[in-house]
Each structure stands twice: as structure tokens, then as C-alpha cells.
Design a protein with these regions (language model features):
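Short amphipathic alpha-helix that is part of the acyltransferase structural core
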Residues: 1-30
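Generic structural signal for conserved hydrophobic packing positions in ordered secondary structure
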Residues: 15, 71, 103-105
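Hydrophobic alpha-helical segments typical of transmembrane helices
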Residues: 32-35, 57, 70, 89
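A short helix-loop-beta-strand connector motif used in the catalytic cores of GNAT acetyltransferases and
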Residues: 37-48, 99-102
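Conserved beta-strand in the GNAT
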Residues: 48, 54-63, 68-75
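A generic "binding-loop/recognition-motif" signal
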Residues: 67, 109-110
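Conserved acetyl-CoA-binding loop-helix of GNAT-fold acetyltransferases
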Residues: 76, 82-95
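Conserved GNAT acetyl-CoA-binding A-motif
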Residues: 90, 95-108
């Protein structure tokens, strides 16, 4: 069963490993630990998906919680894709942003 957490920023190594396992690591500075740590620290909305103790998805966003939410990273492990996890992370991000908030997600191919 997949569970979701809002506001909990997981261990940096776990997030980097997730990015690699989701292919998002191809487009993020995963070899620059300081930058990755800052990216996580400065996001004001982080929602994660868990399969037991394994992080399987993450939505990392910036929001003013009243008008606009920018979903800068959406990653789901390849092994857990096509199970609705990404859609649920998007839904929860939109909901956390507020009822009148516009959600922006720029997606890459693949």
C-alpha cells in the first residue's frame, strides 16, 4: 500500500537515489549534493509517496498558497510508475496549494 506524507523532507541520499530510479536524475544536478540539498530545503511544499520504508515518489514545489504553485519536480520510480502515484502526488500538491491556486508543471518527454 502506498502512503503519502506532506511536509516531510526525506534524507538527501534517498531523494537522489529516487531521482536516479525515476530518470529525473538525468535532468537534475544529482552529483552536486550541496545544490540538491538547497533545492529540497528551499522548496516550501514537498509531498512524498512511500511503499513501506522505500520512497517511491516525490513532488517538490514552490507555492504562495493562494494564487500560484509551481511543481518543479515530479518523480516516481520506474518500478512504481503506471500505478497512479504521480497523479496522486499532483492532486495532493494542487490541494495543498489552495482551492484558488493555479498549478504549473512543465513536463519533459519520457
Amino acid at each position: 500500500m502506498i502512503t503519502y506524507q506532506t511536509g516531510h523532507v526525506p534524507d538527501l541520499d534517498a531523494v537522489i537515489e529516487l531521482y536516479r530510479a525515476s530518470t529525473l536524475g538525468e535532468r537534475r544536478p544529482i552529483d552536486d549534493r550541496e545544490r540538491m540539498a538547497a533545492m529540497l530545503k528551499n522548496a516550501n511544499l514537498v509531498i512524498t509517496a512511500w511503499d513501506g520504508s522505500l520512497i517511491v515518489g516525490i513532488a517538490r514545489a514552490l507555492s504562495d498558497f493562494c494564487y500560484f504553485t509551481y511543481l518543479s519536480d515530479l518523480a516516481v520510480r520506474v518500478s512504481h510508475q503506471r500505478k497512479g502515484i504521480g497523479k496522486e502526488l499532483i492532486r495532493r500538491t494542487q490541494s495543498a496549494g489552495g482551492p484558488k491556486t493555479t498549478l504549473l508543471l512543465l513536463a519533459a518527454p519520457g
